[in-house]
Amino acid sequence: MYPIKRNRRLRSNESIRSLVRETILSPNDFLVPLFVVEGKGIKDEIPSMPNYFRFSLDTLEAEVKLLWSLGLKSVLVFVKVADALKDNKGTEALNSNGLMQRAVKTIKNVCPEMLVMTDVALDPY
């Protein structure tokens, strides 16, 4: 005989349901990739990635402010290192005035609380 009462202890009230639910995504869960290039006034869409752009440092400022205002608090920075600066050891990654270092400084100047992650991206070397 099938039971008349179904004991759903994990669904008995909202507090328990919210505790055991599988997934909830919020802006805090997202990491936004930022692609940075040398130059001024650059915001070029990446053809293979619709709605993603390459930013110069000056246009990066506005993007970081926008992301923060939307509640997005983490970014992952990728830079396009000029071919002339590439070598077998990836020494540009250690340049204190390199594009990556300047990009991180720009982001932190605009939004000190932004979580910034970087990718040295040695694969193009």
Write out the residue ranges for each language-model feature.
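Short, well-ordered coil/turn segments that N-cap beta-strands
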Residues: P27-F30, L70-S74, C111-M114
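Alpha-helix-loop-beta-strand connector modules within alpha/beta enzyme cores
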Residues: K86-V120
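Glycine-rich, proline-tolerant flexible connector loops at the mouths of alpha/beta enzymes
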Residues: K43-F55, L72-G98, Y125
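Non-catalytic positions within long, well-ordered alpha-helices that form the structural scaffold/packing
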Residues: K65-W68
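N-terminal amphipathic/basic leader segments beginning at the initiator methionine
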Residues: M1-R21
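N-terminal small/glycine-rich loop or linker at the start of catalytic domains
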Residues: L25-Y52, M117-Y125
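Generic structural signal for well-ordered, non-membrane alpha-helical segments
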Residues: R9-N13, P27, F53, L57, ...
